[in-house]
UniProtKB/Swiss-Prot annotation:
GO terms for cellular component: cytosol; glycine cleavage complex. This is Glycine dehydrogenase (decarboxylating). The modification N6-(pyridoxal phosphate)lysine is found at residue 726. The lineage of its organism: Bacteria, Pseudomonadati, Pseudomonadota, Betaproteobacteria, Burkholderiales. It comes from Paraburkholderia phytofirmans (strain DSM 17436 / LMG 22146 / PsJN). The glycine cleavage system catalyzes the degradation of glycine. The P protein binds the alpha-amino group of glycine through its pyridoxal phosphate cofactor; CO(2) is released and the remaining methylamine moiety is then transferred to the lipoamide cofactor of the H protein.
Amino acid sequence: MKLEHPDRLMNRTPLSLAALEVHDAFAERHIGPDAADQHAMLEALGFASRAALIDAVIPKTIRRTETLPLGPFTQPKSEAEALAALRELADKNQVFRSYIGQGYYNAHTPTVILRNVLENPAWYTAYTPYQPEISQGRLEALLNFQQMIVDLTGLAISNASLLDEATAAAEAMTLLQRVGKPKSNVFFVADDVLPQTIEVVRTRATPVGIEVKVGPASEAANANAFGVLLQYPGVNGDVRDYRALTEAIHAAGGHVVVAADLLALTVLTPPGEWGADVAVGNTQRFGVPVGFGGPHAAYLAVRDEFKRQMPGRLVGVTVDAQGNPALRLALQTREQHIRREKATSNVCTAQALLAIMASMYAVYHGPHGLKTIALRVNRIAALLAEGAKQLGYTLANETFFDTLTFDTGARTQALLDAATAKRINLRRVSATQVGLSIDETTTRHDLADLLAVFAQAAFTNDVPQVDALDAKLAASNTASVPAALERTSAYLTHHVFNRHHSETEMLRYLRSLSDKDLALDRSMIPLGSCTMKLNATSEMLPVTWPEFGQIHPFAPAEQTVGYREMIDQLEEMLVAATGYAAVSLQPNAGSQGEYAGLLIIHAYHASRGEAHRNVCLIPASAHGTNPASAQMAGMQVVVVACDAQGNVDIEDLKKKAGQHADKLAAIMITYPSTHGVFEQNVREICEIVHAHGGQVYVDGANMNAMVGLTAPGQFGGDVSHLNLHKTFCIPHGGGGPGVGPVAVGAHLAQFLPNQISSGYERAPNGIGAVSGAPYGSASILPISWMYIAMMGAKNLTAATETAILNANYVAKKLAPHYPVLYSGPGGLVAHECILDLRPIKETSGITVDDVAKRLADYGFHAPTMSFPVPGTLMVEPTESESKEELDRFIEAMIAIREEIRAVEDGRSDREDNPLKHAPHTAAVVIANDWKHAYARETAAYPLPTLIAKKYWPPVGRADNVYGDRNLFCSCVPIADYE
């Protein structure tokens, strides 16, 4: 609804209240071009209306004819109305004091980090740092994360985060399979590993032929296993000395991975010092809200010889063109976007934002602060253990860091009931045992309450007093950690962890890092296949509400009513958008959604007695996660050719489907295609695969071009994953978090993922858990709920149409300068377009990399480089960018083309030109010694508009080859920056 100007309204009969109430104002803030701008853009394209454009772009055979069936969310809510509605749901949650533990702990987020990282768009709207020159701030923060992990685990090298502890353990298993015993397929898991980790490891193991054996750790050396997983400390609290066991496992030819509690490692001997080959774990308790299970940043650290087998992102140190230190993503040839089905993992999005928060928690507290927190946690646990013993309880684990398990016998239910009455959650271990874990937030008052609960269940009013217990422990000098396992080595000695402890210094450090980066708060990020749209403030606000942030994933169901209602509503919203029958929100990244979808397809075939179907057809243009996920799901990848127009080659598809008809499991297609086109024959593709016994997996990476206009579940898809961090407004966070829901047809709903260990069993024949928590990254789901609630059906469709309009406008304006490689009928594209720079390289020597780096001088993040076609740029402007910003990008691209023409016609040197030396730092431009044939002004201010709005890249072009040849993935000395 658009209101007329108030001055004009004053001269008329007053409008009714209903006419003055604005419910869809948010849509006007989310969608960039206003009506006048859209009219001008449509006119440039030769269309009278947006509807006419959409009719020309999307095949009529797949058009959605009905309005999105969003039920109570069909009509948009205002920002205030949506927040109020979500607040009603949040208030149905009950925030108890949680001592459940089991890998999830309450933690204090330092407010300086809360406000200046988690709530700061300079951090949360950034993209994965593939363009290092404009990503130095978050790369430094992630390097700090790696240094923190290396120091605390005692291992040589760490990655820059994984999705959660459970999936990190699964990644470690497959890593050890690649490097381990060639004749063994056994992976041994100690029975005191976190239950959710065991479940995810089993899910991952089955498709690739790994046998998981679970038993007492003492049996590991004789299991003939290629790898062994140990928990340190164990789930029930035991702190065990595994030195001798590790030596025995190594002697038997196996390797050891240790799931280690990061806070405990500040006081316990790190795994790397007692022989572990790999360490994994969760960094959640380093200042990240528990959030009903996520998102949190996991870690994985290895011995040096395993570094090239690591999954996930790895930040390394290199030099720039001037020889100064620079950071970049290292060893990318391990990853899915290059290695495809041979990659070390299918991980694309990880948990960068949460890793940055955890690293800044370590920077803020420093080694002394962290150890103080750990010692306080341990002390409170020891005081509770002593008090419970005085009340007649038996402690099942005499050694502990923060977790206690009590033999409670007949008192079990009474103890749990007494705790519930005080709004306290304990962990029911069994009918005769109760466990609990102390955390950073536990206070003296909380300890007194816990002692009172234990006393009540023991039917006594004689509650042990905290001060008396403290004095007794001090006098006895008893230790809960074996002396042999007390940490003696130093950690976090680098200056970054020892100089930013005042809030002033911390604030300025965070600001200095964010100033180095280009994020959506500065300019558009036109990355194809990434959908870098607005992450609105109203969508983000609920993430930090305690009613969402302070709920344990294994809390009793009666305490999570609001969460589950919100999740149910969001699932129904996504069902409406996709045209499928059911959705699971458990996968905590798009890669995990893909993987879950393929496991569901396998389970479906197996239920029909066709478990032998294992061939997955994948078009040559597919995203790298597709073949990597297929390999992880135990499938054989068969590539289907694309024709000259970039579409799936129908004849080759028929041939491959026929050749593999007896074993065909699925095809994975992306729609619109990764070439940015709505393929006209998508229904035929689906029919061919179905006719040969396969299922159709439609990758939802490009769902932003479909919402409200077409639906994969209606044109032949059987299963899809979505990217809520693309289409539905969860921010990219500099490389995560993400959410990758899996959506399925009615015949596949019974196979959606469960999590038996936590009692989450939604599907009768569900696959095993694919994430550590039942609902994955639950605490960021309100972002997508808010987006859909504020947009409503009509405006969601309008957003899709505008995304297509913006892409076609950019393509039209740039086509005279850069050929648009693929298009549909009428020369139109979907929501993105591919600019072909290969002819430019032939005529000028200028590469796609040169253009990408030069864009930084113009204040823009480069589009997606060399995907899906080498030597191209893929541009996706999204619906959120205004015509003004689109024109600014178009102007920059045309100006760069003129710079290239100057090289082509000899006005500029082929080597000494502003593209070859881009990006230009301020230090380079103001240096006394300027040796280039072009002017300083050309380097720094190629357009007059940049004078008022200039972004300076902090480093020159990063040397990728040097960085990989001289791999260094820890914090560099401060002298290197001086």
